[in-house]
Every structure is written in C-alpha cells, then in structure tokens.
Amino acid sequence: MIKIAVPNKGSLSEAALEILKEAGYKGRGHNKSLNVVDEENGVEFFFLRPKDIAIYVAQGVLDLGITGRDLALDSRAKFNEVLALNFGGSTFRYAAPAGEEWDVAKLQGKRIATSYPNVVRDHLAANGIDAEVIRLDGAVEISIHLGVADVIADVVSTGTTLRQQGLEPFGEPIVTSEAVVIKREGEDVTADENVVLSRIRGILNARHYVMLDYNVAEEKLPNVEAVTPGLTGPTISPLAREGWVAVRVMVPRKLANQVMDSLEELGAEAILASDLRIARF
C-alpha cells in the first residue's frame, strides 16, 4: 500500500484534497483523522503539518508527499520533486520599509526576521553575506515596527499584508514556490506510485484545457487548423451539410475566448467550449 502525506490544514490542504478527490481517491471525511485508508486504490493518506512532510518522506517513512516547495526546502530534507501541482503559488522574498533603498548586498550585518530560517541562511551563504537570522513562527511583518529586525523574509502571494505594514519587497525572489509532490532523494518512482501521479496529471491537464467543437466549411480547414492545431491535430468528421465538417480540438483554457473570436472571423459556426473532467496525454 502506498503511503502519501497530505497537509493537515490550510489552503494547501484544501486544494490537495480537492485534486485527490477528483482523481478518484477517498476523502478525509468529517472526523479529521490523522490517516485514511483507501483500500480500493491501495493508498493510505497521512495528514501532517506541511512543514514536516518533507522530513517524513526523506526518512522513507512515507512514499510520496504533497507540500509547498518553500516548506520542503526549509526542512533541509533530502527529496526530489516529481510533480508540480499548479496551486499554492507564491514567492519568498526580502522586504523592508517602503521608500528605503535596499538590495541583497546591504543585508550584511543586518537582522532578518523570518519563519523560514534555513531558506534564508542558505540564500545568504550563497551570496557570501553574514547576517543575523531571527526565527519567528508568525506575524513576521510586524517585527520591524517592534524593533526586532531590520528587514524580513516572508512568503508573498498578493503583497497586501506587506503594504498594510508599510513594507515592500526588494531583490529577486529567494524561492518561487507552489505545491509539489515529493519523493525521497535517490529513489525511483514505482509503477504503483506512477498510477497516482498519472491520475493527478489527468486532473491538472483537464484544468488547463477545454474541448472546442465547431462546424466549418471544408475549404476553410487550412485556416482554422492554423488557429486550432490541437495537441496532435484536430478530429474532423463530415457533416450532412455538403462541404462542411465538424471539428473537435483541445485548446488552452486561457486562450479559449481569443480562439473562438478567431474562428468566428474565419466563418466557423456552432462554436462550443466544454470543460474536461480528466485528460491524459
């Protein structure tokens, strides 16, 4: 039975559970158990603190884990990323009072407050900077106002919290993060584990694409195929209407409206976009 770690709370947990549910796995239910056995699919899920998941996976106690890249890096556990999940996106950055001119070189000898001390220490070491790293478990943004730190290093999603405290980020992102599936470093993905990953990829693909159906005059096929090439080419079927064909093709979701505009200009009719539930390529 495959053992998989899932975040036990927060936005990462909610999104991970949703994607696993769509992939056909048993949910956690309302009892908030620390583990759930899905006998039908041969998987046992363990609900752990996101910060601890990489440690369990690196020790070989669990086969796979879903957590944030930044959290996994801060644990300094030995792991490999096997799949990016396209949710939980953020950047990890330095920030200082707005209006002050800062760059990474000016961190020499300064106090840096953060909830990710190892990520910060590794970044400072890579840049040859000696600074004091102050670990805080939360509310990092207020530390400068209270005189605890000169700058902070924190997760930035929208930047709203920083602005509310009169702070602004500086320098390039230390880490660009998102939710990822991880495995112990040096271990290959097994056939059973690959089934899990394939199911998840199928959900991610479905979220990324829509199915487009439309009718068009056969003589215009070269023009519309240039707009909708699909992954390996469109599916084309003859219609009862002489000289016309039906076309079915997948297009990236974010481009669907622009593509439909172009098709309409080219004379296509009955243009329909449909959501996909699962899509394996």
From Swiss-Prot:
Feedback inhibited by histidine. One of its GO terms (cellular component) is cytoplasm. InterPro entries: ATP-PRT_HisG_long, ATP_PRibTrfase_cat, ATP_PRibTrfase_CS, ATP_PRibTrfase_HisG, HisG_C, N-reg_PII-like_a/b, N-reg_PII/ATP_PRibTrfase_C. Its EC number is 2.4.2.17. It is found in: Cytoplasm. Keywords: Amino-acid biosynthesis, ATP-binding, Cytoplasm, Glycosyltransferase, Histidine biosynthesis, Magnesium, Metal-binding, Nucleotide-binding, Transferase. It is an enzyme of class 2 (transferase). It catalyses: 1-(5-phospho-beta-D-ribosyl)-ATP + diphosphate = 5-phospho-alpha-D-ribose 1-diphosphate + ATP. GO terms for biological process: L-histidine biosynthetic process. Pathway: Amino-acid biosynthesis; L-histidine biosynthesis; L-histidine from 5-phospho-alpha-D-ribose 1-diphosphate: step 1/9. GO terms for molecular function: ATP binding; ATP phosphoribosyltransferase activity; magnesium ion binding. Its cofactor is Mg(2+). CDD domains: PBP2_HisGL1. Pfam families: HisG, HisG_C. Catalyzes the condensation of ATP and 5-phosphoribose 1-diphosphate to form N'-(5'-phosphoribosyl)-ATP (PR-ATP). Has a crucial role in the pathway because the rate of histidine biosynthesis seems to be controlled primarily by regulation of HisG enzymatic activity. NCBIfam families: hisG, HisG_C-term. Belongs to the ATP phosphoribosyltransferase family. Long subfamily. This is ATP phosphoribosyltransferase. It comes from Corynebacterium aurimucosum (strain ATCC 700975 / DSM 44827 / CIP 107346 / CN-1).
